[in-house]
Curated annotation (Swiss-Prot):
Residues 1-21 form the signal peptide. It is found in: Membrane. This is FK506-binding protein 2A. One of its GO terms (molecular function) is peptidyl-prolyl cis-trans isomerase activity. InterPro entries: FKBP2/11, PPIase_dom_sf, PPIase_FKBP_dom. GO terms for biological process: chaperone-mediated protein folding. It comes from Rhizopus delemar (strain RA 99-880 / ATCC MYA-4621 / FGSC 9543 / NRRL 43880) (Mucormycosis agent). PPIases accelerate the folding of proteins. It catalyzes the cis-trans isomerization of proline imidic peptide bonds in oligopeptides. GO terms for cellular component: endoplasmic reticulum; membrane. The chain crosses the membrane at residues 132-152. Belongs to the FKBP-type PPIase family. FKBP2 subfamily.
């Protein structure tokens, strides 16, 4: 019985290790002050360059086009590995992501660029983060709430406590 429990524990532990080893990221540059962080509902502008694992030549780069990519997270417009890897990034932060095949181009790959079932390395620079719940969101909500309290209060029908009686 005890050996059965240990066996299950070790099997579970090895499974968890395999899952967490599937994707790797490292921060190359992180700003001292981090304002907004990318979240699942953010619209971000990123520069990135991608290469096949084990090769030095990049097959895709927004730096060549000199225009960062603007994308709303959570819509499935990015590779899953990139989208997962940029969560929590600050403006100005640069990360290197090692993305496994199942979160990149999978069993198909990209003909003449990425072989099937191959990991890719993506360097991502966060140019801008625009979150719907930024500071301006909360300030505007506070202003609207204050305006409601000041101007929007009407007496409830039957409540005559604040109306002066005519004599």
């Amino acid at each position: 019985m005890f050996s059965h429990v240990i066996c299950k524990f070790l099997l579970t532990l090895s499974f968890i290790t395999i899952i967490y080893a599937a994707k790797s990221e490292s921060t190359i540059n992180k700003p001292e002050k981090c304002g907004l962080k990318a979240s699942s509902s953010s619209t971000v502008r990123i520069h990135y360059r991608s290469r096949v694992w084990g090769q030095e030549e990049y097959f895709e780069s927004t730096y060549i086009r000199e225009a960062p990519l603007e994308v709303k997270l959570g819509n499935g417009n990015l590779l899953k590995g990139i989208e997962d890897g940029i969560h929590g990034m600050c403006t100005g932060e640069i990360r290197r992501l090692l993305i496994p095949p199942n979160q990149a181009y999978g069993a198909i790959g990209i003909p003449n660029l990425v072989p099937p079932n191959t990991a890719i390395v993506v360097d991502v620079e966060m140019v801008n983060v625009n979150s719907p719940f930024s500071l301006w969101f909360w300030i505007s909500g506070l202003i609207l709430f204050s305006a409601f309290l000041l101007f929007g209060r009407k007496p409830i029908k039957g409540d005559t406590s604040n109306i002066k009686k005519k004599e």
